């Protein structure tokens, strides 16, 4: 786990120093994870295919993890849905909200942010800086949205 985190931070650091424009195509989980780390978030208990519910189509796109950092002192489970492209995002986006009923025990505190073709969702409430860091990381990783 430490080695994975070190690789993500190293890659993110190199990208930050390159001064290049954001990618024109969506990035993968390593870039999103690096974006989280660059913005002061930490995460563990990463599970590929963990959509938070029994939706097979979402599970193919999902990664579940526990995250915290900045003003979010208590870890919270996040579900990251990495859709292949804009068309897949549009087709499956509403499924994320339906799936949330499985893990959001209080629908009033369900949180999500999206930047096509990505969605990050989970039980809340999320602290403001934490939410902003998630939004910034996935927006950067989304590039032009696939």
Give the positions of each predicted feature.
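Bacterial signal peptide processing site
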Residues: 15-18
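A short, solvent-exposed beta-edge/loop patch
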Residues: 100-146
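C-terminal motif of bacterial Sec signal peptides marking the signal peptidase cleavage site
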Residues: 10-13
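Immediate post-signal-peptide N-terminus of mature secreted/exported proteins
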Residues: 22-32
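Second-shell loop/turn segments in exported
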Residues: 21-23, 77-82, 117-125
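Short, solvent-exposed recognition patches
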Residues: 30-105
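Bacterial N-terminal signal peptides that target proteins for export
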Residues: 1-2
